[in-house]
């Protein structure tokens, strides 16, 4: 083995160890914080059961066209997979929460590893969300919007989950900035960039 080959092998091992450590760190934090929460959607539950870590961005529409659209990345061992998943919640439509409505999406491993590193560095599992109320904590009374979509960040392990949500996060971040919401938008934008999809509402 040449010196160059040796150095390359050391770099590869170091990168792998770093990614594994980040995954372990995120999983440990989520395991502790999210033990009392459950997942109602059977498709998301299946992803949880079949992977070590699931990270997802969901756009939730509950006003006119009731639906949830997910962009998902999932890690099992050292492999990442991406998915697009849409659930139609309209009563006069067939139930959409079935395996056939989840579609694989190409994802870049380096980008997924970078997202995991970002989540670890920023401790994104501590994002609180607005819980459907108190959208503008600074009391800006001119900051109002109706019938907008909500957004949710899912970080799921086999033992727990965190899933902070914000109503119209881009709108409210513009008129009354909030540190947690800004981090939420930063993380979910990275997920959108990784799982390229056409036609998902923001």
Language-model features and meaning:
Residues 1-29:
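Bacterial Sec-dependent N-terminal signal peptides
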Residues 20-202:
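Function-determining sites in protein domains
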């Amino acid at each position: 083995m040449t010196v160059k080959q040796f150095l390359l092998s050391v770099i590869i091992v170091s990168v792998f160890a770093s990614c594994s450590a980040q995954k372990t760190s995120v999983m440990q934090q989520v395991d502790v914080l999210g033990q009392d929460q459950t997942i109602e959607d059977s498709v998301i539950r299946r992803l949880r059961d079949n992977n070590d870590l699931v990270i997802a961005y969901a756009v939730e529409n509950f006003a006119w066209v009731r639906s949830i659209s997910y962009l998902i990345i999932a890690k099992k061992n050292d492999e990442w997979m991406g998915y697009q998943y849409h659930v139609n919640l309209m009563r006069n439509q067939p139930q959409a929460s079935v395996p056939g409505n989840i579609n694989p999406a190409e994802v870049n491993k380096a980008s997924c590893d970078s997202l995991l590193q970002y989540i670890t560095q920023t401790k994104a599992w501590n994002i609180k969300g607005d819980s459907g109320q108190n959208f503008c904590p600074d009391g800006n009374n001119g900051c109002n919007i109706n019938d907008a979509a909500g957004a949710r960040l899912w970080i799921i392990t086999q033992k727990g989950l965190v899933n902070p949500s914000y109503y119209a996060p881009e709108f409210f971040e513009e008129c009354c900035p909030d540190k947690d919401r800004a981090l939420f938008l930063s993380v979910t934008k990275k997920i959108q960039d990784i799982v390229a999809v056409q036609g998902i509402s923001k």
